[in-house]
A protein has these predicted regions:
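Second-shell loop/turn segments in exported
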Residues: 88-91, 127-134, 167-170, 213-218
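Extracellular/periplasmic catalytic domains that process cell-envelope and extracellular macromolecules
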Residues: 53-57, 81-84, 111-114, 150-152, ...
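Oxyanion-hole/transition-state-stabilizing segment in secreted/luminal serine hydrolases
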Residues: 69-84, 98-142, 147, 158, ...
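Extracytoplasmic/secreted envelope proteins and their assembly/folding machinery
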Residues: 98, 102, 134, 138-145, ...
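Structural recognition of the beta-strand scaffold that forms the well-ordered cores
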Residues: 59-64, 87-92, 116-122, 156-161, ...
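Central antiparallel beta-sheet cores of small beta-barrel/beta-sandwich binding domains
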Residues: 247-352
């Protein structure tokens, strides 16, 4: 047998080996369906009850982790505005990774339903250094998409790029960028569409403002407003309904902030608000020449939220978390004051 023939056989053997290897299914943790314990199972079972109760009456589902679950918390008002009329169901569980979603999809979360659209945003909890590589994350997300396609043959899938996390660029963000670049290839415009809106949550410098993500991972109400707005056109097109047109009230200007003091008397303070879309900044003056910046400020519709941090002369801090609603050019709301582990909530108001 001559050398040329042997080399041909060797090349064919190598190609055959690589083909078999490429055909093998990955077996790492991100693609191995796995349940969790405790409250997770209780929420999973509640999902199963929900889908049973709404058989044939669900048009839109959201599949994900704590960021998706947060539609029931900080994102509740946004959800009601954008999805309350759309027969939508939230299937997000805090802490979930791709393997946990895979298990849920096999154990009742999709039983008997056929939504028009499934929004998927999963993977950030797989991105820790000791968890999965970028390639493994891609495998996990791909497995979730394939599972949805198989179990929901009539459903269009809107796959979202994993949202950025961390105040500034870091290794974890870098890994997420690699993953997003790869999973966009799952888009076929027939069953799967891909949408990356991560830039909507960042400043031009690449930093993430606390007004959008207070802990640089989970959204504030304003953050959920940005999320909903960014994908509304795509959602509306897929559902074949009228898009939601959201406008924010104008909070800009000089206000007089009023709150009841320790002696029962009303105390007035100047409040300055500057608004840029769903974000706000500004200051409040308390006492002579003591101005405090409005932190983590954001708005949604006619609702506003911000935080003020005040250093105490004897040490420590007072943290005031304010939420309010604009009614006939008057702001009314609640302020929660936190100090030394104790919390107090009282009413406040403001007028221009």
């Amino acid at each position: 047998m001559n050398r040329f023939f042997l080399s041909i056989l060797g090349s064919l053997a190598l190609v055959f080996t690589l083909t078999l290897k490429g055909a093998e299914k990955p077996t790492h943790s991100a693609v191995t369906p796995a349940p969790r314990e405790g409250g997770w199972m209780k929420r999973h079972e509640q999902f199963n009850q929900n889908v049973q109760a709404h058989q044939g009456d669900i048009d839109l589902i959201f599949v994900g982790d704590s960021i998706t679950q947060g539609w029931e918390g900080a994102g509740k008002a946004v959800w009601e505005t954008y999805y309350g009329h759309r027969k939508a169901l939230n299937l997000g569980i805090g802490g979930d990774r791709t393997q946990h979603v895979l298990w849920r999809l096999d154990h009742g979360n999709l039983e008997g339903i056929s939504p028009k659209v499934a929004v998927v945003m999963i993977g950030t909890n797989n991105s820790g250094d000791d968890r999965n590589t970028a390639d493994e994350m891609v495998d996990g997300i791909t497995a979730v998409v394939h599972k949805l396609k198989a179990k929901l043959p009539e459903t269009k899938i809107l796959l979202l790029g994993i949202f950025p996390r961390g105040e500034n660029f870091n290794d974890q963000r870098g890994k997420i960028l690699q993953v997003n670049q790869a999973i966009q290839k799952l888009q076929d415009w027939k069953r799967v569409q891909y949408l990356d809106i991560g830039h909507r949550f960042m400043e031009r410098s690449g930093s993430i403002p606390k007004a959008i993500m207070p802990d640089f991972l989970h959204f504030s109400t304003a953050g959920y407003g940005i999320w909903a707005s960014a994908m509304e056109k795509r959602i509306s097109t897929l559902l074949k309904d009228r898009p939601v047109e959201m406008t924010h009230a104008d909070f800009s200007g000089e206000w007089t902030f009023s709150i009841q003091g320790p002696n029962g008397q009303m105390v007035d303070s100047p409040l300055n608000i500057k608004q840029n879309g769903a974000r706000i900044r500004g200051s409040m003056t308390m006492g002579p020449d003591r101005s405090f910046a409005l932190e983590h400020g954001g708005i949604f519709g006619d609702q506003i939220a911000f935080t003020i941090t005040r250093d105490r002369p004897q040490g420590g801090q007072m943290i005031y978390q304010l939420k309010g609603t604009l009614k006939d050019q008057r702001l009314e709301g609640k302020v929660t004051a936190k100090m030394d582990g104790e919390t107090t909530t009282i009413d406040w108001s403001a007028k221009r």
